[in-house]
Amino acid sequence: MTLELLKKYFPALTDDQISKFEKLEELYKDWNLKINVVSRKDIDELYLRHILHSLGIVKVQSFNPGSKILDVGTGGGFPGIPLAIMHPESAFHLVDSIGKKIKVVDEVSEGLGLENVTSFNQRVEELNGNYDFIVSRAVAVMPTFVRWVKGKIAKENVHERKNGILYLKGGDLSDELKDYRTAKIFELSDYFEEDFFQTKKVVYLPMKYKG
């Protein structure tokens, strides 16, 4: 799977975005030899399993200029770095408690010249700030995740959709989401035809500001 996969689903990519996504693969392959943040199997399918998967969030919600997005448990930078490439006028804060993963985030961001990415090597519960949307990729079950990010949603809505969580998940979520009646599930197979996305979803959960 190559860069053509991204062009297929995002035909409006600018030359600068295409250049960054191209360089992204080189940077991750290089850094993954030093610090294993992506499995050996997945690194060969980086565009499909990590980059395009991250961009599934964009199919559900794009971010307006000036918005602030928090990526919780970012690992080596997913979904935050691909989202930051797509939204150069939005601010992305990427947090992870594991220092070596944040090292990769910093090096990749610097290598791409991404000025809209800030990293934090700490637990999300210790992070101060309010965000329009909080994104992540299956780092915990929803009740735990909601507890982690409580109090981090911005008061004002700058998008048509209310501020909240955009969570990349997979499988049967009926039990996990039974207490969240306002949650909405978007099937990524509705947007991407590859088999990998058959069970993949974006869960949107609106959240209220708690001052």
Curated annotation (Swiss-Prot):
InterPro entries: rRNA_ssu_MeTfrase_G (IPR003682), SAM-dependent_MTases_sf (IPR029063)
Residues the entry annotates as binding S-adenosyl-L-methionine: G73, F78, V124, E125, R137
Keywords, alphabetical: Cytoplasm, Methyltransferase, rRNA processing, S-adenosyl-L-methionine, Transferase
GO cellular component: cytosol
UniProt-annotated location(s): Cytoplasm
Positions in coiled-coil regions: none
GO MF annotation: an example: rRNA (guanine-N7-)-methyltransferase activity
Entries under Pfam families matching the protein: GidB
CDD domains on file: AdoMet_MTases
Primary site of residence: cytoplasm
Superkingdom of origin organism: Bacteria
Known EC number: 2.1.1.-
Class in the EC hierarchy, top level: transferase
Matching Gene3D superfamilies: Vaccinia Virus protein VP39
Listed HAMAP family: 16SrRNA_methyltr_G
Function, as annotated: Specifically methylates the N7 position of a guanine in 16S rRNA.
Family: Belongs to the methyltransferase superfamily. RNA methyltransferase RsmG family.
Protein name per UniProt: Ribosomal RNA small subunit methyltransferase G
Species whose genome carries this gene: Christiangramia forsetii (strain DSM 17595 / CGMCC 1.15422 / KT0803)
Taxonomic classification: Bacteria, Pseudomonadati, Bacteroidota, Flavobacteriia, Flavobacteriales
